[in-house]
UniProtKB/Swiss-Prot annotation:
The gene is rpsP. Belongs to the bacterial ribosomal protein bS16 family. Residues 99-109 have a biased composition (Basic and acidic residues). The keyword Transcription regulation does not apply. This is Small ribosomal subunit protein bS16. NCBIfam families: S16. The keyword Repeat does not apply. SUPFAM superfamilies: Ribosomal protein S16 (SSF54565). The lineage of its organism: Bacteria, Pseudomonadati, Pseudomonadota, Alphaproteobacteria, Rhodobacterales. PANTHER family: 30S RIBOSOMAL PROTEIN S16, SMALL RIBOSOMAL SUBUNIT PROTEIN BS16M. GO terms for molecular function: structural constituent of ribosome.
Amino acid sequence: MAMKIRLARGGSKKRPFYRIVASDSRMPRDGRFIEKLGTYNPLLPKDSEDRVKMDMERVQHWLDQGAQPTDRISRFLEAAGHTPKKERANMKKAQPGKKAVERAEEKAAKASAAAEAPAEAPAAEAAAEE
């Protein structure tokens, strides 16, 4: 049985409240779970102690049993100092493409050439006046 430690949504419309649960990965998100491990209330301030509450003993038990935490639960465990921080893959989607990089280089080259040209012009005028 593939186990997950994940969030099960509760609360009302626009007022989310989550239970941290250990459940079979094939069950629905808010469906049947094996054990409630804690709570997460995103409406509380980030520095509040009541925002995330977990029974770390039971979480460790399920991790030892082979349960896989979801991304959000992994971040909670990292913040609690329970697991080491993972190196996350930075998405390349936000970086400019090849064409945009080429255009930026061309624009920078033109700007530097334009900056050099006016600097040479006054020197030529000074030589002509003498």
